[in-house]
Amino acid sequence: MPEGDTVLQTAARLHEALAGQVLTRSDLRVPRFATADLTGRTVLDVTARGKHLLTRIEGGLTLHSHLRMDGSWRVYAPDERWRGGPGHQIRAILGNAEHTAVGYRLPVLELLRTSEESRAVGHLGPDLLGPDWDPGLALDRLLAAPERPLGEALLDQRNLAGIGNVYKCELCFLARVTPWLPVGALPDGVLPRLVTLAERLLHANRDRPTRTTTITSELRTPPGPDTSPAPSPGPAAARSRTRPPVRVRERLYVYGRARRPCLRCGTPIRLADQDDRPTYWCPGCQSGPTP
């Protein structure tokens, strides 16, 4: 699932393959821009803004794309087989003499003037991986709606840009609160530490091929107080007393681990929808309302 760190990696790959090169092939397979021809123009740079990709092209043009849930950009050598999906899922092709970038299943693809990029990304909050990162502004925006559930607030890119559903679940676990707890009900000091941890986690994963939240030094000081109850008697509790706090083979604490034992307390991880997103939490470690 693309989030701020993976989008940044995608931007870096596209920039390396396309920037400074003249396009010899251009194919935008969306009705509005199907006749647009970018061949002969030089790609200036490719940059990430939150979870958005901006490919800036000679002549004051920007190709704006968003991966959402399952979109992707792949880069291929001239003789390499395209393996990103069937041909009908291709939405964009940008090629030069050395590489071809192919966009698959792109739910958002538009060509706009570079001077009008704010139409696409001007609504975004501070970018967790960007030069404009401002934790104070992100905190203010989160606190502007204290009644809003924390999980929904973290996903709102107007508050802070770059968090997706995986990080939402993991951050709430690390804060020891459920995603349904209102922002204003968080214990004192937890939200600022959570915002700081979000930035640290995305930076820790920005160059990793596989995202993890369980084997990084950024987790040495958890953002929330330990409000988890003592484990109830039984096999799970016995296992939790001897289980190390982190097992290297597990990349994530809760996301994708429904019904499996919590890495901290052994309680089975729960799964429910929040705003149509699958949401994972540990009822033993995380306090707050649940569905």
Residue positions per predicted region:
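Acidic, proline/glycine-enriched N-terminal capping motif
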Residues: 1-124, 283-291
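Basic, nucleic-acid-binding surfaces and adjacent catalytic neighborhoods in DNA/RNA-processing proteins
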Residues: 22-37, 47, 81, 142-291
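Phosphate/anion-contacting hairpin/loop surfaces
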Residues: 63-176, 182, 189, 194
